[in-house]
A protein has these predicted regions:
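Mid-to-C-terminal alpha-helical segments outside catalytic/metal-binding sites
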Residues: 2-8, 26, 30, 36-51, ...
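Short, well-ordered coil/turn segments that N-cap beta-strands
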Residues: 4-6, 53-59, 80-85, 109-114, ...
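Histidine-centered catalytic micro-motifs
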Residues: 7-17, 174-177
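Conserved, mostly hydrophobic/aromatic
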Residues: 11, 58, 73, 86, ...
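Divalent metal-dependent hydrolysis catalytic cores, especially in the metallo-beta-lactamase
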Residues: 27-65, 83-91, 114-118, 146-148
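Alpha-helical scaffolding within the catalytic cores
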Residues: 37-45, 68-69, 96-102, 157-158, ...
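Active-site gating/metal-coordination segments in enzymes
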Residues: 66-155, 162-164, 206-210, 217-218
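Catalytic pocket-lining loop regions of alpha/beta-barrel enzymes
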Residues: 128-241
Length: 309
């Protein structure tokens, strides 16, 4: 395996409903994904190559605000060769956040914890990320060499911009491109905000979750391309990373259809640019293990130091 043949999925989920309920799946609109999803399910599903690359490794991301779920994902990462890093959850508002993070890092699979995430998209406070208790928690995250996965909706991007301004040393990655309003709504406000966010060099962006922001049944590559072009122009290939958002992506076509779309959108890209988006940027941000036999290709992203974990 060489790095030029490697594909990293920097954003997917796993859940075992027999072990841990996922109450958000009670929404009738999510009935199609209301079942257990395992690493083997992902292996058997994710067969489409992108620019000739096959899936080599992944970053699994928390779903619920629940430390035991994160513990489960870390223990799984320790046993599962496909999973190279975990984006976990801990209560950023808790005075005990430092102790909780230390326990996670010292526990089973703790070395796989590379970033934290909170579903800010569900918070009604327009300044949630600037709350003093949240900022204290983010300082604890930064102090342990971890990154932060920013999950906000388009109208909440101002919070993400303020976060970037106030935490210039905290490595941040915007999830799902800030959820642009692709399905028949004017994306001008999203574009303006995302370009401002991209002015901060410590902020990267996941090209993920776009198809579920489009019309699930009728979207085409043409619907995705305007958002793709904004992201490439704002962040550049070296600060973008591919993610599937599987199995949520199954609501709008699934892993392979999204992969085929990305393959089409990469037409005309250089080898270096494709490697950055498909593997290099995620490898640097999440401190993933380098690929065996890949010493001939630089997998570093100069603007993103590897977290100290």
């Amino acid at each position: 395996v060489t790095s030029s043949s490697v594909l990293i999925d920097a954003h997917h989920h796993l859940w075992d409903l027999a072990r841990r309920p996922q109450h958000w799946l009670d929404d009738p609109a999510l009935a199609a994904i209301r079942r257990t999803f395992t690493p083997d399910d992902l292996r058997s599903t994710a067969t489409r190559r992108i620019a000739g690359r096959r899936l080599h490794g992944t970053v699994v991301v928390q779903c619920v605000p629940d430390v035991p779920e994160t513990e489960d994902l870390l223990a799984l990462a320790e046993q599962e060769p496909l999973v190279g890093a975990v984006v976990g959850w801990a209560d950023l508002t808790s005075p005990a956040i430092g102790d909780v993070l230390d326990e996670l890092l010292a526990g089973p699979g703790g070395t796989y914890l590379r970033s934290l995430r909170h579903l800010v998209q569900g918070e009604t406070d327009p300044g949630w990320l600037q709350r003093p208790d949240v900022e204290r928690g983010l300082t604890a995250v930064l102090g342990r060499g971890l990154g932060y996965d920013v999950l906000v909706r388009s109208h909440q991007l101002d919070q993400a911009i303020r976060l970037a301004e106030r935490f210039p040393d905290l490595l941040q990655v915007l999830n799902h491109a800030g959820k642009p309003p692709i399905a028949g709504r004017e994306p001008a406000d999203w574009e303006r905000r995302v370009r401002r966010l991209a002015e901060h060099p410590q902020v990267l962006c996941k090209v993920s979750g776009l198809i579920t922001e489009a019309d699930h049944g009728t979207w085409t590559t043409a619907d995705i391309r305007p958002v793709w072009d904004v992201l490439v122009g704002a962040f550049g290939p070296d600060r973008l990373m591919f993610g599937s958002d599987w199995p949520v992506a199954n609501l709008a076509g699934g892993w392979n259809r999204w992969a085929a779309t990305v393959d089409e959108l990469l037409d005309g890209w250089s080898e270096h640019e494709m490697h950055a988006l498909l593997a290099g940027t995620a490898t640097a941000f999440y401190g993933l293990r380098p690929v065996t036999g890949a010493a001939d290709v630089d997998t570093s992203v100069t603007s993103v130091p590897t977290p100290n974990t």
